[in-house]
Every structure is written in C-alpha cells, then in structure tokens.
C-alpha cells in the first residue's frame, strides 16, 4: 500500500532560514574547533596533540577526540551548506534547477568550490568514515593534517558561500 500524500513544497523563506541556521552553526562549530585546538598550543602542536591522543588519562584523550569530533561536525555542516545553498539558488532562479548534477559540481560551475576545499572535503569524508568504522587505526597526524587544512580554507569558503547566497537573494527580491 502506498501513501498518496506528498510533502508540501518547501518555501523559499524556509530554505533561507535553513541556510542562515547552517551558517550560524558553522560559525559556532568553527569557534569550538579553534577552542579545542588551543589545548595543544602553540598553534595546534602535533607533538602535544599526539601525546594527548595516546595518553592514559581520559581527560587528555577527550581533548584530542574533541578536535576530531568538531572536524566531523564541520564536514557535515559544510555538506549541508552546499546542499542547502545550491537548492536555494535553484529555487530563486540564480542557477538552473538541475537536481541531477551534484551540488558540489554546481558550485564548481559558479567558481565557488576551489580545489583546496574540494580536496579538504574528500579528506574530511575519508577521516570521518575511517573514524566511524576503523577508529582503532586512526592516527593523530591524520586528524592534525585535515584540521589544519580546514582551519586555513574553510572560513573563506564559508564566507564566500554566505555572500553568494545572500547576494542573489537580494537580486531575486
């Protein structure tokens, strides 16, 4: 038996709100990541991070895991921002309403998905999957590398997507 009911279409205003909420959560999570890495001063020191990662003290290991957890959250939120931003752009007519082309490819077509962000997202997905399925083999240097790349390239990427979304919204109103 199939259900004949369909979900009502999502309004542009609801999509705008979802994008705004995602941007807010990204800012908060980036702040959390920056706070988490301060436990490994100076400037997210790999030696200090590795020592905490392998420590017998649970509070030190928790600090190391907090960095990894925030990185996972950033990856998931960036994927959400990409998906929501592209969908909003389609709804507003800023880009073609193409549901078959992956949102990341559509951002690339708009020159909004730089190679370094694409590479980071691949690395972060790999790290996230590895941490969920083979966590006992994950090493601190792998997390350290991805986190440093994220700290360097995600803030300008997130800002560019935010500016893009709010820019075409004003044009479409």
Regions picked out by a protein language model, each given a short descriptive name:
Residues 2-173:
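Solvent-exposed interaction patches of small proteins and small membrane subunits
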């Amino acid at each position: 038996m199939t259900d004949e009911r369909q979900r009502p279409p999502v309004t542009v205003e609801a999509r705008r709100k979802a994008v705004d909420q995602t941007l807010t959560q990204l800012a908060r999570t980036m702040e959390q990541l920056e706070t988490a890495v301060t436990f490994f001063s100076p400037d997210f020191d790999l030696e200090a991070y590795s020592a905490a990662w392998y420590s017998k003290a649970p509070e030190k290991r928790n600090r190391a895991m907090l960095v990894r957890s925030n990185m996972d959250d950033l990856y998931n939120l960036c994927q959400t921002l990409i998906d929501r931003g592209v969908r909003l752009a389609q709804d507003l007519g800023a880009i073609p309403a193409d549901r078959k082309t992956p949102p990341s490819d559509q951002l690339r077509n708009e020159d909004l998905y730089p190679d370094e962000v694409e590479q980071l997202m691949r690395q972060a997905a790999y790290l996230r999957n590895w941490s969920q399925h083979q966590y006992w083999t994950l090493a601190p240097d792998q997390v350290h590398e991805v986190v440093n790349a994220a700290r360097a390239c995600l803030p300008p990427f997130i800002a560019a997507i935010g500016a893009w979304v709010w820019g075409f919204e004003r044009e479409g109103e």
